[in-house]
Design a protein with these regions (language model features):
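A generic "folded-domain core" signal
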Residues: 22-185
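Classical Sec-dependent N-terminal signal peptides that target proteins to the secretory pathway
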Residues: 1-24
Length: 185
């Protein structure tokens, strides 16, 4: 009996060590939903957290909106005050802010949706590609700011996304967007 317990514990420890070094796969979803197309990728730290790049036909598919999500178990009760607020973040080494645009109750936690804004697609795509290639990562950390403590609202304050397939995914999203019947001509 002790032998089985001994072997089971060693096997469990071995699996935990091996699986902790597993690397997240870069799986992109590129599709159209209603009038817009998007390309999204799952996070490496929290797989369910997505980073999405959205294109709208009314912009002639020339602008890109960026959104990302953070799931949290923390609910201090006043999370609704974050809506429409700019929360301090660090994008790789760059301190900036992201606007909270939606908070959705999910299971026993909350999914907080942020936006970094709307940008001209060519310039933004080039900037993201250059930033990712320079740092070899695309990482967002929610950080403390004036009258804001990140750990009050977020149990995990950091996530990163693989963007190796960013350019082909955006090109595919542009093609989908341009095929929209609602594109301005």
């Amino acid at each position: 009996m002790r032998w089985i317990l001994f072997i089971s514990l060693h096997l469990l420890v071995f699996l935990i060590i091996i699986l902790s070094y597993a690397e997240a796969k870069e799986e992109w979803t590129v599709t159209r939903v209603e009038d817009y197309s998007y390309a999204s990728v799952s996070g490496e730290i929290q797989y369910g957290d997505k980073f999405a790049f959205i294109l709208m036909p009314e912009d002639n598919c020339n602008k890109i909106t960026t959104m990302f999500s953070f799931y949290t178990w923390n609910d201090p009760g006043d999370y609704r005050q974050l809506l429409d607020k700019h929360i301090p973040i660090k994008l790789n080494d760059i301190e900036t802010t992201a606007e909270v645009i939606q908070i959705i109750p999910v299971y026993d936690g909350l999914k907080v949706i942020f936006t970094l804004g709307v940008y001209p697609i060519k310039e933004y795509t080039y900037m993201i590609h250059t930033l990712y290639n320079h740092h070899k990562k695309y990482e967002i950390e929610i950080i403390d700011g004036i009258n804001f403590k990140a750990n009050k609202y977020f149990d995990i304050t950091i996530n990163r996304w693989k963007l190796e397939k960013f350019i082909p995914s955006i090109k595919k999203a542009i093609n989908i967007c341009r095929k929209s019947p609602n594109i301005n001509t």
